[in-house]
Amino acid sequence: MEDGKQAINEGSNDASPDLDVNGTILMNNEDFSQWSVDDVITWCISTLEVEETDPLCQRLRENDIVGDLLPELCLQDCQDLCDGDLNKAIKFKILINKMRDSKLEWKDDKTQEDMITVLKNLYTTTSAKLQEFQSQYTRLRMDVLDVMKTSSSSSPINTHGVSTTVPSSNNTIIPSSDGVSLSQTDYFDTVHNRQSPSRRESPVTVFRQPSLSHSKSLHKDSKNKVPQISTNQSHPSAVSTANTPGPSPNEALKQLRASKEDSCERILKNAMKRHNLADQDWRQYVLVICYGDQERLLELNEKPVIIFKNLKQQGLHPAIMLRRRGDFEEVAMMNGSDNVTPGGRL
């Protein structure tokens, strides 16, 4: 018996069944496909309680039966290996089937463990992505709220019946003293119709200011007033237009759209064309920008829209006027001053 145990130890390898301290074989059924012939014989000696000299062990060695061939053995093969002993063959076949089923269960368990690991990794990745998307959404929402808050807080408010320029998100209206109204956008637009006071917002309209060369007395009454810019029809112009040709004081005039790159000369010509003024007389007119209580003549090569935006950002509430050149000298004479600022002080 000791010689048999010694033979078992010598024929074992890394994938073979192990022996405990009592000499009992510890089966590694999941590795039986890697067993050698000696490993198979060792397993048969342990499970069937046979000697190494048993015909089964001899037939296994003669036929070179290794571990991966065991599941292929049928009952008849087992009976031939057992030298016609049916009882031993049945027992041998049952042990082979149990070992095969054990390996399949082990594979299923390993597959399930792998699937669980993959699902956990997928869950972790998905959770991280969702958290990242949530953070991005929160930042985007805060940015949008800040923009809306800034936009709403920077909008001018009309209080106590005082008419102010109310820019919309698309058009910035630039009033004109001769009834010309310019708006800061990319293209020239058509007529904007006035809306009723019941509307919450309406296009800003400008009314004609009389030429200063018509009457000195008229200037004395209104020299400290600027053209009224009304956001609805309930606020008419504060300047009378008696004896002034053109539209009536309460008539909404046309509005122009201009881009940032348009020069003063181009805007001036388009304004005159839009309001049916003679094109050949365009040098008799000038564009004047008013901000605070100051007025300044715009040179032909300047960019009125850019200047308008810069002054607006400084909170000076600018407005651009279309005037005749002769009006400025008359204003200086009536004021009795050497101030050559076009249009004088508002």
Curated annotation (Swiss-Prot):
Family matches, as SUPFAM superfamilies: SAM/Pointed domain, Ubiquitin-like
Stored InterPro entries: RA_dom (IPR000159), SAM/pointed_sf (IPR013761), SAM_Ste50 (IPR015316), Ubiquitin-like_domsf (IPR029071)
Gene3D superfamilies the UniProt entry points to: Phosphatidylinositol 3-kinase Catalytic Subunit, Chain A, domain 1, Transcription Factor, Ets-1
SAM domain boundaries: 24-108
Lineage: superkingdom: Eukaryota
GO cellular component, one term: cytoplasm
Biased composition (Polar residues): 151-187, 227-245
Keyword set, alphabetical order: Cell cycle, Growth arrest, Pheromone response, Phosphoprotein
One Pfam short name: SAM_Ste50p
Span of domain Ras-associating: 233-327
Cysteine pairings via disulfide bonds: none
Modified residues (Phosphoserine): 202, 248
Phosphothreonine carried by residues: 244
Entry annotated with the keyword Ribosomal protein: no
Single Gene Ontology BP annotation: establishment of cell polarity
Chain spans, region Disordered: 151-250
Entry GO MF terms: protein kinase regulator activity; SAM domain binding
Other observations noted: Present with 1670 molecules/cell in log phase SD medium.
Subunit structure: Interacts with STE11 through the respective SAM domains.
Purpose of the protein: Involved in growth arrest during conjugation. May interact with the G protein alpha subunit.
Protein name: Protein STE50
Species of origin: Saccharomyces cerevisiae (strain ATCC 204508 / S288c) (Baker's yeast)
